[in-house]
Amino acid sequence: KLTKPLKNKEVKSVEHVRRDHNLMIPDLNSDFILFDFTYDLPLSTYLGQVLNMNAKVPNHFNFNRLVIDHDADDNIVLYAISKDRHDYVKLTTTTKNDHFLDALAAVKKDMQPYTDIITNKDTIDRTTHVFAPSKPEKLKTYRMVFNTISVEKMNAILFDDSTIVRSSKSGVTTYNNNTGVANYNDKNEKYHYKNLSEDEASSSKMEETIPGTFDFINGHGGFLNEDFRLFSTNNQSGELTYQRFLNGYPTFNKEGSNQIQVTWGEKGVFDYRRSLLRTDVVLNSEDNKSLPKLESVRSSLANNSDINFEKVTNI
């Protein structure tokens, strides 16, 4: 809803700015809007496929923070900020600020005030915070019943219904034909497919990888009516992680059963990994749960020697 006023508008000017030290944007007003993403996103992809804007931006410029501001003429100005916080691209648009404020007012009643606590003094510049509701409301807890996606269903999708040779050893079943190979582990219910025809051609170009994997996964029904969303990207290997969401919130699992990991090649899937467990029935629970206070969570994180906050960019 918030991006709707920005769609299909013209970009009047583009400016690329780099800072070797802390990033400063002197033109910012005090009432800007901030969008944070959990992953790096190519600016050209976001402008073209999300906002439907045409703009000549730096090649392969990725960002994970978008600042929405306005200039003296009341035009919306976008600042796409790089993950390392040294670069930003400034785009001045033809969208008027009052149109954006109207959209903001429409959703504000559904928004919940949050407060933040910095987790570690050494990470202030990287804006590593814990966010929690200022006035927490009661939320439901859920228990889920899982069932298993059939291996045959995944094979039909990834092998394109071609003839498959099957072999089994020590709880691992291997399926292959002349273009690909897949392994299924009975114990952890993990499925791993590799496209042999793309063996030398994995892509790390996010401008191609993100649209390709998104269209593939949604197009073939691999989500099976579950809510999976792009959650993280690896710019070196090109691997994308799609995470299962429930009621708008991300789910987490130590064994990775809540994720699909996929890498794109020149013409299609290069590598595809996922658990074949899926949520079947969600059970409401009326049990009361006592959650720890925000400060105790912050303290536990800051004093946990197993967490290296130099490598943490989003909480």
Please provide the spans of the model-predicted regions.
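Preferential activation on post-signal-peptide N-terminal prodomains/segments
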Residues: K1-K205
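Exposed beta-strand-loop-beta-strand "reactive/processing" segments of non-cytosolic proteins
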Residues: S13, F35, F146-K187, L224-L276, ...
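A short, polar/proline- and glycine-enriched secondary-structure boundary/capping micro-motif
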Residues: V89, F252-N253, T279-D287
